[in-house]
Amino acid sequence: MAKKKAFIPFFYFLSIVFLPWLISLCCNKSLKTWITNWWNTRQCETFLNDIQEKSFLEKFIQLEELFQLDEMIKEYPETNLQQFRLGIHKETIQFIKIHNEYNIHTILHFSTNLISFVILSGYSFWGKEKLFILNSWVQEFLYNLSDTIKAFSILLLTDLCIGFHSPHGWELMIGYIYKDFGFAHYEQILSGLVSTFPVILDTIFKYWIFRYLNRVSPSLVVIYHAIND
């Protein structure tokens, strides 16, 4: 009975790890049809907002200019002019489909992540006791480690997260989060986050070493600086 109670927090931790993935999988399947139908019905009333309409018209004008250039070079007869109009029509439909798919994808992923966050927050709130036991286990495990292993682990973690080679990893991670939420890839925003986020983490970490580790374990700080140097 004691062993069973001891493993409850561990299973609770596993459920927290895998719960968002299960929620995302279920919500994607259940919400996709509903969001697609809702978006297609809504599109009958309003097609584009001002920004989307401007972007769409720019692409359409570029396409039309290419067709007109091709027409001037080849000196299209009347039959080919009909093909030109048909090509414009097909490309317009294709632009609309791409636009609709992008918006459906964005709404679906944002809704799924929002639902996952709400459910996971409630799940964590109702399991405070299990989280408290799990936190005690982690603290006991870390306390039993030697200062050398602690310093090595801290140094390894900081080099992975805020080392000179970390920007590529942050770029992949932030890009994955953008994709998971269904947002478009914006190079300027991505570059700004990659260049500032590791610096903020580095500052927080140094402050933590100065305020917490110096008070709790001065020997660990000495070993950390010795390894780092």
From Swiss-Prot:
Tell me the domain of life: Eukaryota
* Signal peptide start and end residues: none
Would the keyword GTP-binding turn up in this protein's UniProt record? no
Cellular component annotations (GO), alphabetically ordered: chloroplast inner membrane
The GO terms this record gives for MF are: potassium:proton antiporter activity
InterPro entries for this protein: CemA
Per UniProt, subcellular location reads as: Plastid, Chloroplast inner membrane
Topology versus the membrane: Multi-pass membrane protein
Q: Does this UniProt record's set of keywords contain Isomerase? A: no
Q: Name one Pfam family in it.
A: CemA
List the catalysed reactions: K(+)(in) + H(+)(out) = K(+)(out) + H(+)(in)
- Annotated TM spans: 6-26, 107-127, 189-209
From the UniProt record, give one GO term of the biological process aspect: regulation of intracellular pH
Provide this UniProt record's keywords sorted from A to Z. Antiport, Chloroplast, Hydrogen ion transport, Ion transport, Membrane, Plastid, Plastid inner membrane, Potassium, Potassium transport, Transmembrane, Transmembrane helix, Transport
What function does this protein fulfil? Contributes to K(+)/H(+) antiport activity by supporting proton efflux to control proton extrusion and homeostasis in chloroplasts in a light-dependent manner to modulate photosynthesis. Prevents excessive induction of non-photochemical quenching (NPQ) under continuous-light conditions. Indirectly promotes efficient inorganic carbon uptake into chloroplasts.
What HAMAP family does UniProt report for this protein, alphabetically?
Answer: CemA_PxcA (MF_01308)
The family this protein is said to belong to: Belongs to the CemA family.
Q: What is this protein called?
A: Potassium/proton antiporter CemA
Query: What lineage, starting at the top, does this entry show?
Result: Eukaryota, Viridiplantae, Streptophyta, Embryophyta, Tracheophyta
